[in-house]
Swiss-Prot record:
Annotated S-S bridges: none
UniProt keywords, alphabetically: Host cytoplasm, Host nucleus
Gene: NS
Descriptive protein name: Non-structural protein 1
Pfam families according to UniProt: Flu_C_NS1, Flu_C_NS2
Amino acid sequence: VKSTNLMAFVATKMLERQEDLDTCTEMQVEKMKTSTKARLRTESSFAPRTWEDAIKDGELLFNGTILQAESPTMTPASVEMKGKKFPIDFAPSNIAPIGQNPIYLSPCIPNFDGNVWEATMYHHRGATLTKTMNCNCFQRTIWCHPNSSRMRLSYAFVLYCRNTKKICGYLIARQVAGIETGIRKCFRCIKSGFVMATDEISLTILQSIKSGAQLDPYWGNETPDIDKTEAYMLSLRETGP
């Protein structure tokens, strides 16, 4: 039911941006909307609700109304792959938070070398997770913007650090087998807490990220507390982890 509501919300919001979609993409979104309505009718026997109700519930699951955001004003990011650095393009996008799971709200743990954008990339069945090495903060948001170079859409769930007020990572589903498939991959990755990888090393890193969020003494904070986080990290430097 929740997945259907989320898909209803995503399809509706994407169709509101038809001017950004090419013909092929628009047809795929319409197909996704049709299949979601069919699922809604199937579920009506045990979870009766209207299409409008599904959209509203999907919006609540995303925890807020989608906002039109400008390009973030921050240091340009880059990702190193095979010895080469590639810039990360933070284009104007629609941003909306997804949920308030406390495990994903741990304070950020910054590096002390000042390198905010040291990043690594993980791949899993068509989805790519880019995670900066200096942050253990998971404020989940959706970031959906058109990729003008290929005239297609990329779907990215952004991890936003609530302490440094900067983007700390994101999960992208490439348009391989259709829009609906790509978005579902993103949902599955987020629900699993990112404990997935294609090799043992990446799996170990991702597991440590998730366990670190649970073990950090400040992970339950409802509001950012940069002073406490910095003091905690300084104590670790002085006494050792």
